[in-house]
Regions:
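Patatin-like phospholipase
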Residues: 1-42, 50-279
Length: 279
């Protein structure tokens, strides 16, 4: 079984609907009462990490699979009714407030730390947020962390425009080390050896034209992500970190809606966690 001490961190990558893999991992951790003194999540990793921190086993799976099938909160339907491809009003207000209540009390009473990552649209840099008591601000932060560029409107935290933290820090391993945690368990949503295209990502001239540093960050996104993957694999080989990831390329897209594919990926996450942690 995994040996956790006061210097051990849990790092959660995002990946949109690929995050159901992480849901499986976190449910395994909760089933075995495995807790970390510090965790950090990006985008879907932030969403699922919140349910882990409030000890709500199964909440991530229910939100990402069962309620997706019922409410169809991704795709053309929310695009027509709202301002993006994802119904954020449903996800970040109706779900935690009424449909799938979030246990803010349990989260506030959890002595362990949890940070969420966003991208500052003005500076083009990562922001790291730690909030346990202001319920409105918690939602603002996790919503911003999960606001995919192009697919969602900008979100605001303390009046500052923010987008998905994965733009600049998809795998915040170095952040965990900077915070003093030199033992990390990293949960990825891509298989070993995966790399994005090395070409710079073109950003249409009419998009985010008032945010030049954000545009630079978007163009360099693939390069930064590949560098983070290389660091993860190098440190894994050196025995510095433990990595839980899909064993083979997955067929689930960032905005996947297939219940079967999502359920299979959730189960894969649970089994991968069991295999890695139990050896």
């Amino acid at each position: 079984m995994l040996n956790i001490d006061e210097k051990t961190a849990l790092v959660l990558e995002g990946g949109g609907m690929r995050g159901v893999f992480t849901c499986g991992v976190l449910d395994y951790l909760m089933d075995h009462k495995i807790r970390f003194p510090y965790a950090i999540g990006v985008s879907a990793g932030a969403c699922n990490g919140l349910s882990y921190m409030s000890h709500q086993r199964g909440r991530g799976k229910f939100s990402n699979i069962d309620l997706l099938a019922k409410y169809k909160y991704i795709g053309i339907r929310p695009l027509v009714k709202k301002r993006g491809l994802i119904d954020q009003q449903l996800l970040f207000h109706r779900f935690p407030d009424r449909i799938l209540p979030y246990n803010y009390k349990a989260y506030a009473e959890n002595p362990n730390r949890f940070e969420m990552v966003t991208t500052d649209c003005i500076t083009g840099r990562a922001c790291y947020w730690e909030e346990k008591h202001d319920e409105k601000r918690i939602i603002e932060i996790v919503k911003a962390s999960s606001s995919l560029p192009y697919a969602c409107p900008m979100s605001y935290v303390d009046g500052h425009p923010m987008l998905d933290g994965g733009i600049v820090d998809s795998i915040p391993l170095l952040r965990a080390y900077e915070q003093g945690y030199d033992k990390c368990v990293v949960v990825l949503t891509r298989n070993k050896g995966y790399r994005k295209s090395t070409k710079k990502v073109p950003v249409p001239s009419f998009i985010y034209k008032q945010y030049p540093r954000l545009r630079v960050a978007l163009r360099n996104r693939n390069k930064i992500y590949n560098e983070q993957l290389e660091l993860v694999e190098r440190w894994e080989e050196e025995g510095k970190i433990i990595v839980i990831r899909p064993e083979k390329p997955i067929v689930v897209g960032r905005m996947e809606t297939s219940v079967k594919k999502l359920t299979d990926l959730y189960n894969q996450g649970y089994e991968c966690a069991k295999k890695v942690i139990e050896g």
